[in-house]
Design a protein with these regions (language model features):
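PLP-dependent class I/II
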Residues: 1-210
């Protein structure tokens, strides 16, 4: 895969102005067609083995459907990680031994991650096929949720809860008010995290009220 131009330009700006690039890559393993290239991979391709000013964050919450595990890691510029480790030592909460053992098992296994991707492909295909004519569904390139444009996000979320017992999150709750308005307003986050059979039931209920 060729190196994307955007991170190369961003790294050049980081060198010029000395700012840190913190890349949230917790969704990086939930792709559909081709795996994305990560920030540290870009650094390596550029010959930047010190990963200067670059750090990445990974988590089990998305790749393994384990948001409650609170297990993840940060990697990158050692000069940044040293003070971060000290901060984490004094301000972070240690995982129990049981959680650490479960985390090791999850990090060492890729089979369930591949199955996870397969399941999300099937769920998105289900929604596109069954609801594409009823809702403005735009399939993302990766991830597990739709960012759906609606007339009023709070009213739409309330309608789905009252009429179909389906919970979605109003987009305005994910952002803040600015002088230009709320960027999440009139969008809803529709996450396909339930299993395929439950998603089929969701589709059935949505078709009944839309």
């Amino acid at each position: 895969m060729p190196i994307p131009l955007k991170p190369i330009k961003l790294i050049a700006l980081s060198d010029q102005y000395n700012f840190v690039i913190a890349s949230d890559e917790c969704y990086s393993e939930l792709w559909f067609d081709e795996a994305p290239i990560g920030l540290l991979e870009v650094c390596a391709e550029m010959g930047r083995d010190d990963y200067k000013n670059c750090v990445v964050f990974h988590s089990l919450s998305k790749r393994s459907n384990l948001p409650g595990m609170r297990s993840g890691f940060i990697a990158g510029d050692a000069a940044l990680l040293k003070p971060y480790l000290q901060y984490r030592t004094y301000h972070g909460a240690a995982l129990s031994v049981q959680h650490q053992l479960a985390s090791i098992a999850a990090w060492n296994d890729e089979t369930h991650v591949e199955e996870n991707r397969k399941q999300y492909r099937a769920k998105f295909e289900l929604f596109q096929t069954e609801l594409g004519h009823l809702l403005p569904l735009k399939k993302p390139n990766a991830g597990f949720y739709y960012w759906l444009k609606v007339d009023n996000d709070e009213k739409f979320a309330r309608l789905l809860m009252e009429k179909a017992h389906i919970k979605v999150l109003p987009g305005r709750y994910l952002s803040r008010e600015t002088e230009h308005g709320n960027p999440g307003e009139n969008h809803v986050r529709l996450a396909l995290v339930a299993d395929l059979e439950q998603c089929k039931e969701v589709v059935k209920r949505l078709k009944a009220i839309l």
